[in-house]
Amino acid sequence: MARAMIRLREIECCEPVREPGVLTLNERQRLIGVFKALGDGTRLEIFRLIAAQVEPICACEIVDRFAVTQPTVAHHTKVLREAGLIRVSRRGIWAYYEVDPADAEALEAITGTILGRQERVAALA
């Protein structure tokens, strides 16, 4: 039976399995933090809302769109901030959130590494 399986695999048109790129310890820790932060459905949707904006979005706008209180939004945005996904600026008593472009580029590079896409993109260029 084992020989039959080996022969079958030789006949099939499967591509060789590609190994993903190596993650540094910092990249790995960052990804763990990012995935933990986005692992909550409400936080994921808050992040998506913030990321969809051209300008920073006020916390009051986030509260209005979700069935949560202002302290809950503050908690979720704190987790997203600590994961390096967003940044906050203050204007008087209001907090405004946006995706930090530098963090977004770093995150894209890290997720590209975890998915092994950097090599594929470079090969296509």
Regions found by a protein language model. Name each.
Residues V79, I93, V121-L124:
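A detector of long soluble domains/segments in diverse envelope-associated and cytosolic proteins
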